[in-house]
UniProtKB/Swiss-Prot annotation:
Residues 56-68, 78-101 have a biased composition (Pro residues). Residues 22-55, 102-122, 234-264 have a biased composition (Low complexity). GO terms for molecular function: nutrient reservoir activity. It comes from the Eukaryota. It comes from Triticum aestivum (Wheat). SUPFAM superfamilies: Bifunctional inhibitor/lipid-transfer protein/seed storage 2S albumin. InterPro entries: Bifun_inhib/LTP/seed_sf (IPR036312), Bifunc_inhib/LTP/seed_store (IPR016140), Glia_glutenin (IPR001954). This is Alpha/beta-gliadin clone PW8142. Gliadin is the major seed storage protein in wheat. The alpha/beta-gliadins can be divided into 5 homology classes. Sequence divergence between the classes is due to single base substitutions and to duplications or deletions within or near direct repeats. There are more than a 100 copies of the gene for alpha/beta-gliadin per haploid genome.
């Protein structure tokens, strides 16, 4: 038991010799310091030769200084803006050369005219007279179409009475036509009344020609209808129904067949119609001047009718 106690004491002394005293942290506030109980250290017994010497601690390596930092690269200054070049002035517009005036056209009348001979002067006068006559005829023709129709009907009524025609107008209608005819004749100049009378006579002749053509066409249509009826009676009933459209074709042609007269004769007085023209002219000269109390030159009864003047229906 003693040996055991001795060994325990040796062990404790060895451990206490090695233990390093730890410094106690003192509190910041002195008021908070509390007294600590001091534990009495056990007296270390020194045993010769038993303490081991620890090797001296090597000093910590000193930290190597950091390499000196390289200075930052100096920022290069921005390039200074170059001054703008002075702007060149705009090029002045080139002055155009003055335009040359257009060459003036020389009027034709400035050219020296050749002297006109007497024959040429007469021809020009004749041409002017013909043109004036044509213009007068056209004007009178228009007057006839619009104004002298009542005179035509009045003279035509007298002609029908003289020839005992069935186309006789009523008394009231005849009086109205007389008034209208006289009003139109008074508006026509005296020098043109003879031409107006001739136009009235011409219109009457054209009207009679048209009536004759209509009568001829009606007679032809009646004859064709009679021939068709006779053919239908002679043919059997079976053939009639088959050939009936063919038999109707000539009847349609009847209304378009031209008369046997010369086509150029239509619209103008022909030489063979001069006796008829003279008869109607005398009747018009007896009726119209006395009825309307207008003056008509005496040469109007002897002049020849103008050919080629168209009348109205």
């Amino acid at each position: 038991m003693k040996t055991f106690l001795i060994l325990a004491l040796v062990a404790t002394t060895a451990t206490t010799a090695v233990r390093v005293p730890v410094p106690q942290l003192q509190p910041k506030n002195p008021s908070q310091q509390q007294p600590q109980e001091q534990v009495p250290l056990v007296q270390q017994q020194q045993f010769p030769g038993q303490q081991q010497q620890f090797p001296p601690q090597q000093p910590y390596p000193q930290p190597q200084p950091f390499p000196s930092q390289q200075p930052y690269l100096q920022l290069q200054p921005f390039p200074q803006p170059q001054p703008f070049l002075p702007q060149l002035p705009y090029p002045q517009p080139q002055s155009f050369p003055p335009q040359q005036p257009y060459p003036q056209q020389r009027p034709k009348y400035l050219q020296p005219q050749q002297p006109i001979s007497q024959q040429q002067a007469q021809q020009q006068q004749q041409q002017q007279q013909q043109q004036q006559q044509q213009q007068q005829q056209q004007i009178l023709q228009q007057i006839l179409q619009q104004q002298l129709i009542p005179c035509r009907d009045v003279v035509l009524q007298q002609h029908n009475i003289a020839h005992a025609s069935s186309q006789v107008l009523q008394q009231s209608t005849y009086q109205l036509l007389q008034q209208l005819c006289c009003q139109q004749l008074l508006q026509i100049p005296e020098q043109s009344r003879c031409q107006a009378i001739h136009n009235v006579v011409h219109a009457i002749i054209m009207h009679q020609q048209e009536q004759q053509q209509q009568l001829q066409q009606q007679q032809q249509q009646q004859l064709q209808q009679q021939q068709q009826q006779q053919q239908q009676q002679q043919q059997p009933s079976s053939q009639v129904s088959f050939q009936q459209p063919q038999q109707q074709y000539p009847s349609s042609q009847g209304s378009f067949q031209p008369s046997q007269q010369n086509p150029q004769a239509q619209g103008s007085v022909q030489p063979q119609q001069l006796p008829q023209f003279a008869e109607i002219r005398n009747l018009a000269l007896q009726t119209l001047p006395a009825m309307c109390n207008v003056y008509i030159p005496p040469h109007c009864s002897t002049t020849i009718a103008p050919f080629g003047i168209f009348g109205t229906n």
